[in-house]
């Protein structure tokens, strides 16, 4: 099967910027107390459920996975970009990272106790998000949790330069209510939302959504 062009373009772009991206964002959590609070809540929920490891889907240079690991969560990372996987593995040799696409995860049904998708789903065209959210639902155990962070907007951007390099990828921005609807349609129910308004270092609002795959009644 031919790979969709947006995946090919996104992979190539992040292979190009991987090292510079890691230098810019690799320690970003140190100055993001609200994000750390949401990650801590997610970690507590995943540990309490005890339904399996967490996966950082679209893990980039691995800093979010490493933070969760430090909180006691067994976690591994998946990224579309082999160069990002290489950078993450070099930065955190004690963790496991591998290549993969969130559109077709090489994971068993119900294998995960938690999923983090941190600023990765916005690279998926809106019409393909149901496929991704269905994969999240499939791979989560009943009662498992999803933490999704992303930019807020209502537009589709095409980026041609990022992190000092030429790139070619899209960023598909949605309002939080629309993301919540799409998650619900996939069977993932949002229980908490953190919205950060534009401010220092942020040109756009950011949202963090905590969702859960319900257990059978």
Model-derived segments and spans:
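Class I SAM-dependent methyltransferase SAM/SAH-binding core
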Residues: 52-104
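A short acidic, Gly/Pro-enriched loop at the edge of an enzyme's catalytic core
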Residues: 103-115
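Short alpha-helix
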Residues: 171-186
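A short glycine-rich, Lys/Arg-flanked "PGG" loop and its adjoining helix->strand segment in the class I
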Residues: 130-142
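Conserved class I S-adenosyl-L-methionine
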Residues: 1-49, 154
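Core SAM-dependent methyltransferase catalytic element
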Residues: 198-217
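Short, glycine-/aromatic-enriched active-site segment of Class I SAM-dependent methyltransferases
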Residues: 152-170
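Conserved beta-strand signature within the Rossmann-like core of class I S-adenosyl-L-methionine
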Residues: 144-150
């Amino acid at each position: 099967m031919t790979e969709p062009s947006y995946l090919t373009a996104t992979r190539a772009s992040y292979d190009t910027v991987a090292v510079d991206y890691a230098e810019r964002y690799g320690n970003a959590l140190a100055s993001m107390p609200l994000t750390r609070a949401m990650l801590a809540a997610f970690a507590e929920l995943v540990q309490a459920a005890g339904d399996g490891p967490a996966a950082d889907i679209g893990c980039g240079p691995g800093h979010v996975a490493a933070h969760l690991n430090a909180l006691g969560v067994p976690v591994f990372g998946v990224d579309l970009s082999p160069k990002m996987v290489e950078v993450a593995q070099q930065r955190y040799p004690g963790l496991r990272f591998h290549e993969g696409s969130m559109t077709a995860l090489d994971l068993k049904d119900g294998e995960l106790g938690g999923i983090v998708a941190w600023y990765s789903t916005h690279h998926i065209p809106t019409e393909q998000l149901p496929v991704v959210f269905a994969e999240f639902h499939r791979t989560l155990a009943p009662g498992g949790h999803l933490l999704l962070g992303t930019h807020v907007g209502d537009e589709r951007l095409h980026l041609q330069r990022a992190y000092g390099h030429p790139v070619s990828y899209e960023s598909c921005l949605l309002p939080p209510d629309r993301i919540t609807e799409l998650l619900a349609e996939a069977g993932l129910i949002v229980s908490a939302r953190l919205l950060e308004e534009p401010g220092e270092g942020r040109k756009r609002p950011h949202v963090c959504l905590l969702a859960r795959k319900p257990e059978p009644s």
